[in-house]
Amino acid sequence: MTHSNRMLLGVNIDHVATLRQARGTRYPDPVKAALDAEEAGADGITVHLREDRRHIQERDVVLLKDVLQTRMNFEMGVTEEMMAFAEKIRPAHICLVPETRQELTTEGGLDVAGQEARIKAAVERLARTGAEVSLFIDADERQIEASRRVGAPAIELHTGRYADAETPTEVAEELKRIVEGVAFGVGHGLIVNAGHGLHYHNVEAVAAIKGINELNIGHALVAHALFVGFKAAVAEMKALIVAASR
């Protein structure tokens, strides 16, 4: 989550909370998952507190802020409620993500270019908490330029279209978009992270891209953990990223 010469792994624990909320139980505990992830080599922990509270709850975020040994990457929509909460929690990293249809691009990233004044105000306000603010956007030059204009020091490129690509041609096209987006972002002085839909069979090509600071991965880790345990799932992903990014 901080700029590094080696590629970092941010572990998203949202779907541990999804499993808990499915039955309204106290288990499985996303905080325990976060601590296990750190032990297994995670460089940071990502959580998304959604307006509908479908997985992570405020209490999870408060507890994580107190116990994490790495850093929290707090994903949030651009709302007054979330801004006030972030100001109270003061996470090390904040990533602004789309939550409503109006904020989405067709690909699924935040439409920064279409709402620059609103995003600029949010970035400036959140930066005053001391957080490094990033924007979850498509690997699109227009959105990357807008991200720089609004003052965000970092971006997270949306890798969902690459993850969803089915034919070798589509995969190559989407990977090329990411490669070009990374180069364009780095060229504009931005810290470039990436994530969404990455799993054990598609992560290596993205991890091999020079210039990416961190990959944020969640659902694939939680799914694999059902069979191998959470620490092993994280360690396996970390090893893939380290090997591919050498």
From Swiss-Prot:
CDD domains: PNPsynthase. One of its GO terms (cellular component) is cytosol. It catalyses: 3-amino-2-oxopropyl phosphate + 1-deoxy-D-xylulose 5-phosphate = pyridoxine 5'-phosphate + phosphate + 2 H2O + H(+). InterPro entries: Aldolase_TIM, PyrdxlP_synth_PdxJ, Pyridoxine-5'_phos_synth. 3-amino-2-oxopropyl phosphate binds at N12, R23, G197, G218, H219. This is Pyridoxine 5'-phosphate synthase. The gene is pdxJ. It is an enzyme of class 2 (transferase). Pathway: Cofactor biosynthesis; pyridoxine 5'-phosphate biosynthesis; pyridoxine 5'-phosphate from D-erythrose 4-phosphate: step 5/5. NCBIfam families: pdxJ, PRK05265.1-1, PRK05265.1-3, PRK05265.1-5. 1-deoxy-D-xylulose 5-phosphate binds at D14, H15, R50, H55, T105. Its EC number is 2.6.99.2. The record marks E156 as: Transition state stabilizer. Homooctamer; tetramer of dimers. Transmembrane segments: none annotated.
